[in-house]
Amino acid sequence: MQKNAAHTYAISSLLVLSLTGCAWIPSTPLVQGATSAQPVPGPTPVANGSIFQSAQPINYGYQPLFEDRRPRNIGDTLTIVLQENVSASKSSSANASRDGKTNFGFDTVPRYLQGLFGNARADVEASGGNTFNGKGGANASNTFSGTLTVTVDQVLVNGNLHVVGEKQIAINQGTEFIRFSGVVNPRTISGSNTVPSTQVVDARIEYVGNGYINEAQNMGWLQHFFLNLSPM
């Protein structure tokens, strides 16, 4: 009987240790969906025997002489210059104090109450105090710089371009992912086909990685469970 109990205890201990080693916690990606787009082929024109054709096929390799090279179609590329520098700080404090004191006694005690209230037995004194001090503060600073080439995946009705892109960098046994999405106004695109990220509307910038280094920085799901249950 004792042998079976020891065997069960050993199996339970190994199971608990294996569960504490699990570090997989599901997370929702900031940039969702496909991170690239293919050009949409145009309709095939019907030859009418005339020199002038009312409907010309879309030729993505054709570039007019007096036309800039800004992206305007689905599948065109654009370089985003990441220039994010955000800092924020917050502090608050509160103080509260309250003191109170009460005295009660008989100056003259009747003779028949001398045994009960005599010798200052009727004197009552009560005092109390309450003090509260609270202080809180938070500081946050984020800096992100670099370049990322994205693809136009949608042309909005007002001419703005919705762009998405992803860059993957493999370093040893880990992979770093940089994902970006947002809405670009074509007027903010420079002659070198670049636009700073500070001028992108609804910008979503995501920098994540996978591998053993990234897993070592995450808390195990069982530890996360007990952390939520802990009253401390």
Curated annotation (Swiss-Prot):
Q: Which residues form the signal peptide?
A: 1-21
Among InterPro entries, the record links this protein to: Flag_Lring (IPR000527)
Q: Where is the lipid attached (S-diacylglycerol cysteine)?
A: 22
Name of the protein described by the UniProt record? Flagellar L-ring protein
Q: How does it assemble?
A: The basal body constitutes a major portion of the flagellar organelle and consists of four rings (L,P,S, and M) mounted on a central rod.
Q: Among its keywords, does the record have Lipoprotein? A: yes
Lipid sites, type N-palmitoyl cysteine: 22
- GO biological processes: bacterial-type flagellum-dependent cell motility
The text of the family note is: Belongs to the FlgH family.
Q: What is the lineage of its organism?
A: Bacteria, Pseudomonadati, Pseudomonadota, Gammaproteobacteria, Enterobacterales
Compartmental location: Cell outer membrane; Bacterial flagellum basal body
Cellular component (GO) terms are: bacterial-type flagellum basal body, distal rod, L ring; cell outer membrane
In what way does this protein cross or attach to the membrane? Lipid-anchor
Q: Which GO terms describe its molecular function?
A: cytoskeletal motor activity
Q: Taxonomically, which superkingdom?
A: Bacteria
